[in-house]
Amino acid sequence: MSKKVCLIIGGGRGMGAATARQMHSRKYKLALMSPSTSCETLAAELGGIALRGRAENKGELKAIFDLTMLTYGRIDSILIHVGGPPKGDLLDISEEDWDKANDMVLKPVIRMAKLATPVMEKQGGGSIVNITTFSAFEPS
C-alpha cells in the first residue's frame, strides 16, 4: 500500500503545523492549506503540497481537495482546524458576525465531509477531525 495522506486545513501555524509535523514523522504525505504563506513554507520543508486559501471559501476548499487527490490519489486523514465563534456578549454579537462564524466553523466541515466521504468509502476508511477554538490567545 502507498503511504497514507493527511490533508490539513489550517496547517500553516500552531496546532495545524504541529499536527503536520507529527503526521510527517509517521510517514504520511501532506497537503496543507492556510490563508498565509506559512503553509507553503512548511509543506516545502516536509516534502508536501500546499495551497493558500481560506476554509470558508468553497472554491478554495475544493481546490486543495482536488489538488490532494490529483497529487496523491487518496486521502486518509483530514484535519480541519479553524478559528472560533465571535467573542463578546451574546446580545452584542450581530447576526452578520454569527453568519461569518458559521461560514468559517461549520460549513467547511460539511463541505469537506461531502467531498471526502465517497473517496474514503471507496478506500475502505479514513478519518476527519474538526477542531475549533474559543478565546484562545496563547497555549496554557
Description of each model-found segment:
Residues 46-59:
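Rossmann-fold cofactor-recognition segment
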Residues 129-140:
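Catalytic loop of short-chain dehydrogenase/reductase
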